[in-house]
Every structure is written in C-alpha cells, then in structure tokens.
C-alpha cells in the first residue's frame, strides 16, 4: 500500500513541478476570449484555439492597467504563468500582461472610448459653444517649454497686440499628465478675466498624445464654462480632446487665429468703415432737414403768420360769448330762487308753529302716561291669574280641602287600571298618611 499516493500528495507534487518549471513561470500565449462576463474586480474567462481550452484569470490590479475592455471572441496576446489550483486539481493561466492581437492596445482603447462617449452625447454639435469675436485675455494650457506657446504668442501679438496670454504650465505627456490638464482647465474656469482656452501640445506618437484621450480630460473640456480650442499634435493626429472641444485647430498658429478671428487691422478697418457710414448718415440727415426747412419757410404759415391763429381767435370769441350768456342766465336763476326763499320766510308765523309743537308734545306725554298705566295693570292681572294657577297645583292645599292623594311606589295614581288586588298603597291626608292593602278593585266612571 505504500506505493500508492494520495490525491493530495500527487496534486502537491504536480504544483511543485509547475512552480519550479522555468518554461511555465513565463508563458506567451495567443488565444481567443471565451465565456467572458465582466466582473467588478477579478476577471475569469477561458482562452481557446482550434484544439484546446485553458482557464485564465486577470487580477483586478492588473486588469486596470491593460487599457482596453475584453470582449467575447476577441483574439489577444497574453503573458502569464501557469499554476495548479490544489482543491480542484485544475490548472489555469494567471495573466500579467495582455494586448489585442493584430492591433495596438491604445488604438483599441481609443476606439472603445470614442464609441462610448459618442453614445453619451459628448461630441454632439448642440453642446459646442461659439467663439467670441473679440477677446481680451486667452488662457493656454500647454507645456511652458514647447513650441506651442511660442507660436500662439507670436500669432496673437501679430494679429491683435492688445490681447493678453495667460499660460497655465502643464505636463502634457507621461504619468500624471491627464490629471494636471484637468486641474488647469478647472483653474482657468474659476477666473473671470478669461474669454476662452487653448488646450494643446506638439506632435508625437499615440503614447505621447495619450493624455488627451483620457476620459477625465474629455469630461473636463465638455464641462468647461469657457469655450475651448484644441490643438493637439500635427494635422494628421486626432485625439478625443479634438472631438469634444468647441473648435479644433490643426496647428498652434491656427488655434491662435481662431482665438482672434478679427485682427487688429480688421478691427481698425471695421471702425473706420462704421465712422464713415455714421458720417454719411449725419450728412444725409442734415441735408434732408435743410431741404425740409426750405420748403416750410415758403409755406403760407410763414409768409402770413397771422393766419396761423385766425381760427383760434374765432373759437375764443365764440367761447367768450357762450360764457357771458351762461353767467347771465345763471345769475337770473339764482336771483329768482333767492326771492322765492325770502317770500317763504316772510310768510311763516314762528310763534304759532312753536305753540303747535308744545301742544303736540303735551298730548304725546299724556298718551305715554296712559299707555304705561294700562300696561302695568294688564301685567298685574296676568300675574295674579298665574299665581292662582300655581296655587291650585299645590298638593298641600288640595289635601287641606279634604282630598287625599293615593301613591304607588312614591308616584301618584290617577286610574285604578294601575292597581291590582293585594298591592300596598300609601294614602296622603291632611294630617298624615296611611299604608293600605288593596282588597278589591271596582271600576266606576265619575
């Protein structure tokens, strides 16, 4: 039995062989991605060709660095190591590097990101901002030592010497370049004295220009409050920054020309043209008014000015006559009214009217006294009747007159129908009460 190995022992032995074999420590493979479904961290899938399949794993840290998205059926070249997983006895490939077969990883990443951003609307024309015709200050995000800034300064100074250039020194390639570009775009947007931005660099390989293809740079240009002109690489180079920028310039010189669409000479010519047009307009207005004045001076009004107010004098005379007539008629009416009132006042006998009012007052006073007495007497009679009615309901008075009150359970009885033989009753009399028992009940109407 000692010649037999356990499964665990065999698996450990094979794992040791795999780990120590120099040919398996670094393996270069070409295969097709199969059974792939993207996961949030580590990636698990298969690599296959026409004759075999091997399981593959890319750890999360490595996957972040490969720079492109895996797709089902994609053919890739990978570098990795083979290892055995002891619990299942299976072997797999741990991938350390990967790139698409037949196309560069950066080119694939560029195309994948371009499609994604296009679908999200980053490159739509409706988001493009117009460039201002006149600028006072231009922000430039580029390397301080490159030819880009020199070309921009030279062109702007030639076209419009009064325009200021504000340089944001920026790393434009290598690690950290994309983040620095984003930070400087954000800084520029915080300033109130800038009219637009030029973002760019000179030519280079796709690796050199890659910072301008990073998604964070594209998003920063898209969100810029200031209009952005991109000038990245040579005329044949294209970056995602060119797609998202409001305008793209093939060279730094072209970018400076776009930023100053109207040169100083053009501006001065435009001003002179406007001055001349204004001068000609003033001359035409003066000439028109002079001709109009000459025509008016020959009119009847100016030759016979008294005719200008003849009509008003006639109207004034007419109104004066109407006013005099109205005042005369009004005076006569008021005079007649005053005479009528005087006659009425003269005809009144004041002493007689006072005597009549006194007699009427005395008569009303007597009527009031009589009415008050009658009301009091009537109320007294009604009160006495009500008092007698209340006294008639007093049981003590009823009993005092020789009557008795029969109670059953402390309630007075009014009919024998409420009594049965053998019941106990109470009879209330003037000087006491009796407790009796009913022997016989005979109904008799009174």
Swiss-Prot record:
Function (record text): Bidirectionally degrades single-stranded DNA into large acid-insoluble oligonucleotides, which are then degraded further into small acid-soluble oligonucleotides.
Protein name from the UniProt record: Exodeoxyribonuclease 7 large subunit
Organism whose genome encodes this protein: Streptococcus thermophilus (strain CNRZ 1066)
InterPro entries documented for this protein: Exonuc_VII_L, Exonuc_VII_lsu_C, OB-fold_nuc-bd_dom
Molecular function terms from GO: exodeoxyribonuclease VII activity; nucleic acid binding
Top enzyme category: hydrolase
Main location: cytoplasm
GO biological process per UniProt: DNA catabolic process
UniProt catalytic activity: Exonucleolytic cleavage in either 5'- to 3'- or 3'- to 5'-direction to yield nucleoside 5'-phosphates
Pfam families, A to Z: Exonuc_VII_L (PF02601), tRNA_anti_2 (PF13742)
Subunit structure comment from the entry: Heterooligomer composed of large and small subunits.
GO terms under cellular component: cytoplasm; exodeoxyribonuclease VII complex
EC number: 3.1.11.6
UniProt family annotation: Belongs to the XseA family.
Compartments where found: Cytoplasm
Disulfide-bonded cysteines: none
PANTHER family: EXODEOXYRIBONUCLEASE 7 LARGE SUBUNIT (PTHR30008:SF0)
């Amino acid at each position: 039995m000692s010649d037999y190995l356990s499964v665990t022992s065999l698996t450990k032995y094979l794992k040791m062989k795999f780990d120590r074999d120099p040919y398996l420590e670094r393996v270069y493979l070409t295969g097709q991605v199969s059974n792939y479904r993207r996961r949030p961290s580590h990636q698990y899938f298969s690599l296959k060709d026409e004759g075999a399949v091997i399981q593959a794993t890319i750890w999360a840290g490595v996957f972040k660095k490969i720079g492109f998205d895996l797709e089902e059926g994609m053919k890739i070249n990978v570098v990795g190591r083979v290892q055995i997983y002891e619990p299942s006895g299976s072997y797999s490939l741990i991938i350390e590097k990967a790139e698409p077969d037949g196309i560069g990883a950066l080119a694939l990443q560029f195309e994948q990101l371009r499609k994604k951003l296009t679908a999200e609307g980053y490159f739509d024309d409706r988001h493009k901002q117009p460039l201002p015709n006149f600028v006072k200050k231009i922000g430039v995000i580029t390397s301080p030592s490159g030819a880009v800034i020199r070309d921009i300064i030279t062109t702007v100074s030639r076209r419009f010497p009064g325009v200021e250039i504000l340089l944001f020194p920026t790393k434009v390639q290598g690690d950290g370049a994309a983040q620095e570009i984003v930070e400087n775009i954000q800084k520029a947007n915080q300033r109130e004295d800038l009219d637009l931005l030029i973002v760019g660099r000179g030519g280079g390989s796709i690796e050199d220009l890659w910072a301008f293809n990073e998604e964070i740079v594209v998003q920063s240009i898209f969100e810029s409050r200031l209009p952005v002109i991109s000038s990245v690489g040579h005329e044949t180079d294209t970056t995602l920054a060119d797609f998202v920028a409001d305008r793209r310039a093939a060279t730094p010189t072209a970018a400076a020309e776009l930023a100053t669409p109207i040169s100083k000479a053009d501006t001065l010519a435009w001003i002179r043209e406007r001055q001349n047009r204004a001068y000609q307009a003033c001359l035409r207005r003066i000439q028109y008014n002079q001709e109009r004045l000459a025509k008016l001076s020959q009119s009847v009004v100016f030759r016979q000015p008294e005719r200008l107010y003849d009509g008003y004098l006639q109207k004034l005379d007419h109104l004066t006559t109407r006013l005099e007539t109205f005042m005369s008629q009004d005076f006569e009416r008021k005079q007649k009214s005053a005479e009528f009132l005087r006659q009425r006042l003269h005809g009144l006998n004041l002493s007689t009217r006072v005597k009549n009012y006194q007699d009427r007052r005395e008569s009303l006073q007597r009527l009031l006294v009589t009415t008050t007495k009658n009301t009091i007497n009537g109320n007294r009679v009604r009160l006495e009747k009500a008092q007698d009615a209340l006294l008639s309901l007093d049981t003590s008075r009823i009993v005092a007159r020789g009557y008795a009150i029969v109670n059953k359970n402390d309630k007075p009885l009014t009919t024998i129908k409420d009594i049965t033989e053998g019941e106990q009753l109470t009879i209330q009399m003037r000087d006491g009460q009796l407790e009796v028992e009913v022997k016989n009940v005979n109904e008799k109407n009174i």
